[in-house]
C-alpha cells in the first residue's frame, strides 16, 4: 500500500467500537432523514436541494455489525504508511490541534509518521457537494 487517503475522517484507535450502543438485533442502519441529521449537527454544508435528493436516493443501509464490533489494529507499521487527510467539515488546523491535545477522536492522527493535510471546506459529504474538487484532491494525493 502506497498511501491511505482519509476523506473527512481519520484513523481510529485499536479496539475502537464506533457504535457500542447498537442492540444486537439491529442488522442494518438506514440513512436518517436529512432534516434529522441537520438537527443532530451532522455537517450537510454545501448540499443544495438536488444533492440532498441524490444523497437520499442513492443511500444504502450500513451493516450494523461493522459499527458494533471492535476494530482490531495489530500492526504498528500502519503508522508508517503515508497518509493524506482531506479535511472538509473541520479545518486541518483544528484536526492538528485536537490530535496534539490528545482528543479521543483525533489522538490516532498524532501517531501517523507521514501525514499531509488538504483543506476542502464543505460538509461531511464532499462527494455530493464538491465532487470534482474531491476527485482532484484524491488524484493529487494518489500521485504523491
What spans do the regions from the language model cover?
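A structural signal for isolated positions on well-ordered beta-strands in alpha/beta enzyme cores
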Residues: 3-5, 84, 116
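Active-site nucleophile elbow and catalytic-triad environment of alpha/beta-hydrolase enzymes
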Residues: 54-76
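Short, conserved loop/helix-junction motifs that constitute active-site signature segments
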Residues: 1, 74-80, 110-112
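Conserved loop-alpha-helix segment in the C-terminal half of the alpha/beta-hydrolase fold
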Residues: 92-121, 136-141
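Glycosyltransferase donor-binding loop in the core domain
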Residues: 126
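Short beta-strand/loop motif that positions the catalytic acidic residue
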Residues: 79, 85-87
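Residue-level signal for the nucleotide or nucleotide-sugar donor/cofactor binding architecture
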Residues: 129
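Flexible "cap/lid" loop of the alpha/beta hydrolase fold
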Residues: 1, 5-41, 65, 72, ...
Amino acid at each position: 500500500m502506497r498511501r491511505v487517503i482519509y476523506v473527512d475522517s481519520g484513523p481510529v484507535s485499536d479496539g475502537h467500537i464506533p457504535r457500542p450502543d447498537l442492540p444486537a438485533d439491529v442488522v442494518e442502519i438506514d440513512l436518517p432523514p436529512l432534516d434529522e441529521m441537520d438537527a443532530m449537527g451532522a455537517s450537510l454544508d454545501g448540499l443544495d436541494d438536488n444533492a440532498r435528493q441524490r444523497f437520499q436516493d442513492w443511500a444504502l443501509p450500513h451493516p450494523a455489525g461493522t459499527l458494533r464490533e471492535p476494530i482490531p489494529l495489530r500492526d504498528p507499521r500502519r503508522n508508517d504508511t503515508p497518509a493524506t487527510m482531506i479535511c472538509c467539515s473541520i479545518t486541518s488546523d483544528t484536526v492538528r490541534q485536537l490530535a496534539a491535545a490528545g482528543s479521543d477522536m483525533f489522538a490516532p492522527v498524532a501517531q501517523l509518521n507521514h501525514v499531509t493535510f488538504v483543506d476542502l471546506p464543505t460538509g461531511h459529504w464532499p462527494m455530493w457537494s464538491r465532487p470534482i474538487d474531491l476527485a482532484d484532491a484524491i488524484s493529487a494525493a494518489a500521485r504523491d
